[in-house]
Amino acid sequence: MKNQYLPVLLLLSVVTLAQTKDMIPQTVEFPSGTLHLKAYLWKPAGPGPFPAVLFSHGSGGDKADLTAGMQITESADILAPFFIKHGYAFLYPFRRGHGPSADQAPFMQDVLLSEEKEKGRDARLQLQFKLMTTDQIDDVLAALAFLKTVPGIDIHRIAVAGNSFGGQLTLLAAERDSTIRAVVTFAAAAGSLERSAELRDRLIAVVRKTNAAIMLIHAENDYSTAAGRSMAEELERLHKPHSLKIYPKVGLTSDDGHNMLYENIPAWEDDVFKFLDQYIKG
């Protein structure tokens, strides 16, 4: 999918960048098991300690260096200025097989496509669930462990955020690490929840267990908003801190809606940072 709003987003990033200091990311390496993964790290100017957000990208398009129709490194560059502007350090890890970490493992979509061709759609969904709950979440947790060692990071004020498949991983991370204080998901499990009862049950179990505040975001024209609505319903039943935001349609297609994180930053910026400030800085 070609990102039709990318020139505008790049302009917004440039303007924000001009208003912020020290915006060149530090390329860092962290271990995940026997692998050596890469990440981009930004910190606000000053000594800190800073609250921090770890961001999990989606599972990619048809190439290992793409996400949401753009270069995966470019997506990191687009998002980072907004987090820095609001006073948050920002870590963008590249999971195994993706972007600068592509040399550490096969690209997940290639693995899933091969599984589907050989064994069918259901087998692909089962393998995707397995990878989500093993290798992929291991990489996120490894990045989180690394983040806590970075000088100038306040380890008591950490949030996780993610888009699409990465949004699912943020929820799993919050279940596994009780120090995470807030979760923000964009389009998590959109279109996947209806195809996998296993995934649906797992995500509901996650929101029952975690004590982190959870913000669930979709555009109205996402592939589906059922995942956010069902998790919000369970969180409401349990009286846990949460926010569900279903924003108006973005662009013309469901792809546009699914990628509203990048397509319409002005729509979510104030809401997301109000939420993060409440539960991370408050």
Model-derived segments and their meaning:
Residues M132-K209:
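Primarily recognizes the serine-hydrolase "nucleophile elbow" in alpha/beta-hydrolase
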